[in-house]
């Protein structure tokens, strides 16, 4: 089950109370104070783990709390610290305040550990309150309460390449033949109901991650179809690959324009992202010479449109996932784009 958003209350542990205690030994009838301190409450810590892929472990849970600190004891024994609660989440998880929508944490790297809520401090035992005018203090501090916060955990997949296209255009077939992902494939719309990640090995030394996002339909940015719920996942991809289907009644140019408009409505930043275009099912030209000519005209119209909008950054390639033609060229094209983006990112962060 793919769970990508959960609402939950998180609370760190309360500090244990300090002890009120006095020495009780033979021949010492009025022993001084020996109350120990309370233990600190446990912390809430987020841990990013790429072996975890969804937020399903949080499903159905309304509240998670770290352990409270133990109370102090006599003979100056301090209470034990409460156990921390470590929450394991997949890469791409954001922790968002439900009331303000502020992003509190953004977990993007394997092994990343972030302290989220600090446990309450334990109270001081009565030993600390002995002074010249009060040799036998009969009070100690209570522990400080832990922190509590209502948050929403949201998972946005992190990938190098995000596949963008209408339902049933060949995205799942593509990712199944170029990567280790095994999505469900069938000849009907919305086969892909959840995002899928696949590792694409280009050669012995180079690879990248590709994301198959459920198909977008016109109006997805307004909530139609399955697209809106998963458009956010495309935000975490570095490069977009539009997958267009020559077998659809809608011309290739129109497919591209509609898809781009949906991205623009959802996010201006996403609209301006670098992209490539893949014409899928190139083996369909075998359906006849007339059909092949129509596809060629369609592609030419799209190519001219790309020149009109002055977008020299994009590439256009024909691929058949079934016959495995054009796949090698596509992988190397994508790798070059990703390398450029990675290098630019390094330059920006120096």
Swiss-Prot record:
Residues 1-158 form the Obg domain. Mg(2+) binds at residues 172, 192. GO terms for molecular function: GTP binding; GTPase activity; magnesium ion binding. GTP binds at residues 165-172, 190-194, 212-215, 280-283, 320-322. Keywords: Cytoplasm, GTP-binding, Hydrolase, Magnesium, Metal-binding, Nucleotide-binding. InterPro entries: G_OBG, GTP-bd, GTP-bd_Obg/CgtA, GTP1-OBG_CS, GTP1_OBG_dom, GTP1_OBG_dom_sf, OBG_GTPase, P-loop_NTPase. Its cofactor is Mg(2+). GO terms for cellular component: cytoplasm. GO terms for biological process: ribosome biogenesis. Monomer. Belongs to the TRAFAC class OBG-HflX-like GTPase superfamily. OBG GTPase family. An essential GTPase which binds GTP, GDP and possibly (p)ppGpp with moderate affinity, with high nucleotide exchange rates and a fairly low GTP hydrolysis rate. Plays a role in control of the cell cycle, stress response, ribosome biogenesis and in those bacteria that undergo differentiation, in morphogenesis control. HAMAP family: GTPase_Obg. This is GTPase Obg. It comes from Campylobacter jejuni (strain RM1221). The lineage of its organism: Bacteria, Pseudomonadati, Campylobacterota, Epsilonproteobacteria, Campylobacterales.
């Amino acid at each position: 089950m793919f769970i990508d958003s959960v609402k939950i209350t998180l609370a760190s542990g309360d500090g244990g109370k300090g002890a009120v205690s006095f020495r009780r030994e033979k021949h010492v009838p009025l022993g001084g104070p020996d109350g120990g301190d309370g233990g600190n409450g446990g912390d809430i810590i987020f841990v990013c783990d790429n072996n975890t892929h969804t937020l399903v472990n949080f499903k159905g849970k309304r509240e998670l709390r770290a352990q409270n600190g133990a109370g102090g004891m006599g003979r100056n024994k301090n209470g034990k610290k409460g156990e921390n609660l470590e929450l394991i989440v997949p890469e791409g998880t954001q922790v968002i305040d439900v009331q303000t929508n502020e992003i509190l944490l953004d977990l993007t790297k394997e092994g990343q550990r972030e302290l989220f809520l600090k446990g309450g401090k334990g109270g001081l035992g009565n030993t600390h309150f002995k002074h010249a005018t009060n040799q036998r203090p009969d009070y100690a501090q209570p522990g400080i309460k832990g922190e509590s916060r209502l948050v929403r955990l949201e998972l946005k997949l992190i990938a190098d390449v995000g596949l963008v296209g209408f339902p049933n255009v060949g995205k799942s077939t593509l990712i199944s033949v170029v990567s280790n992902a095994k999505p469900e494939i069938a000849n009907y719309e919305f086969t892909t109901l959840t995002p899928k990640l696949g590792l694409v090995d280009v050669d012995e030394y180079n690879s990248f991650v590709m994301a198959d996002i459920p198909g977008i339909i016109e109006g997805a940015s307004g909530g139609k179809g399955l697209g809106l719920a998963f458009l956010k996942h495309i935000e975490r991809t570095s490069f977009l690959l539009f997958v267009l289907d020559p077998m659809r009644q809608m011309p290739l140019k129109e497919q591209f324009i509609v898809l781009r408009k949906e991205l623009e409505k959802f996010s201006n930043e996403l609209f301006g992202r670098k992209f490539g275009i893949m014409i899928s099912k190139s083996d369909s030209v075998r359906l006849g010479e007339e059909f092949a000519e129509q596809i060629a005209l369609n592609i030419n119209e799209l190519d001219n449109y790309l020149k009109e909008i002055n977008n020299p950054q994009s590439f256009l390639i024909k691929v058949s996932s079934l016959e495995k033609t054009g796949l090698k060229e596509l992988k190397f094209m994508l790798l070059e784009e990703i390398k450029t983006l990675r290098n630019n990112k390094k330059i920006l962060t120096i």
